[in-house]
Amino acid sequence: LNALKRFPVAATATIGLCISLLLLVNLPYEQVKGSILYEPSYWYVWVGALPLAASIALCFENRLSPTIRHSVSLLAVLLWSLYGYISNDTPEHFFGALAFIAPIVTFFSSLFWAAFLKKDTDTSFWNFSYLLCIQILTGLLFASVLAAGLSLALFSTDTLFGCEFKSEMYSNIHVLCYTLFFPFYLLGNIPIASITETKVHSFAQAWKILGLYILLPLLILYGTILYAYLIKIIIQWQLPDGWVSALVSILTIGGTITLFILYPLCIQENRPLKFFRQWFGILLLPLLILMTVGIIRRFQDYGITTNRLYILLLNFWCYTTALYTIFTSGKKIKIPFISFILLFLISSIGPWRFSEITRYTMHKRIDTLIQNNKLGTNNLLTFD
């Protein structure tokens, strides 16, 4: 009931997704093929509607009346549905699907930060994110136990009494547990952002072990390997391998995640972590230059591709994150995550997205080759 009262649009979207999946599971293939249930964009719209509506409601929970807030959520879902309907992208292909996946990832991530767009809300943001993660894991655990228990009960009835249930019954159980029970549980237990403590919430010992004794040593190991490689290529005076970009990216993203996980210890001025957060950004800069050189080498050797444009954008984000960490001493954790998601979104949708830039560049190169080698006449490609 709390889910319906607080997030009516998101709850309605959950019910719609559940009903659609039940129809997909139970209808004959001949009926499904050729129907709207066979369209990938239809499913992208349903999956994105839930987090979008919930994020809008969280963003305006303390700013607008419930009626206006829910109306804005409904309008956002309708616009998202219109985007799915009029989009020219082909979801069957990876980069076409990315035009839908990027917004959906943004919608889901905004559940964590939509209510904390104001300045100096990093502590409340961390508390809210921590509590939300606990609710997500708890909800998934409950849904899994419920699905397993009901499936076992169905199997036992089938075995003992020879009822011969159809295999679709097991699928129906999982659909109901994971697309109805779990979302309703989560919507009903999302923390209220306005009452999130301004002091850091105490966190589980497991998080401290993960961040301080597992992730941090791994980051030191990666950093040592990369600095040894940097010294090697300087001595040998050779260009870096393009694969070094992956390791530097992992180091940057891993360091950012570690700072997020250990945020309470950052506030408490934990000595090992204090050294890490003060020097992390500074030590990253030489490695990021190494990454940039590797990217430039790839562009020179193989030209522009969509993947390389994403790597270049990631390199830009790594620079900004390193500089931001230096200037804030690693005590601000919100901006790096929001900027990462928004850059991914902007570069994946619209006519300016990287896949379109790559397609345009390749067409221009092919046209230039045809004209320079006189391979075509009247816009037609000809061969001797």
Question: Which residues are covered by each model-predicted region?
Answer:
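Membrane-interface segments at or immediately adjacent to transmembrane helices
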Residues: 350-384
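Alpha-helical transmembrane segments of multi-pass integral membrane proteins
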Residues: 17, 107-114, 136-155, 174-188, ...
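Internal/C-terminal transmembrane anchor helices
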Residues: 331-354
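Membrane-helix interface and helix-disruption motif detector
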Residues: 26-45, 62-67, 86-101, 159-173, ...
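Membrane-interface helix-loop-helix junctions at boundaries between adjacent transmembrane segments
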Residues: 61-72, 83-211
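Alpha-helical transmembrane segments
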Residues: 6-27, 49-50, 69-81, 103, ...
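Membrane-embedded alpha-helical segments of integral membrane proteins
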Residues: 149, 251-257, 275-328
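N-terminal signal-anchor module of multipass membrane proteins
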Residues: 1-64
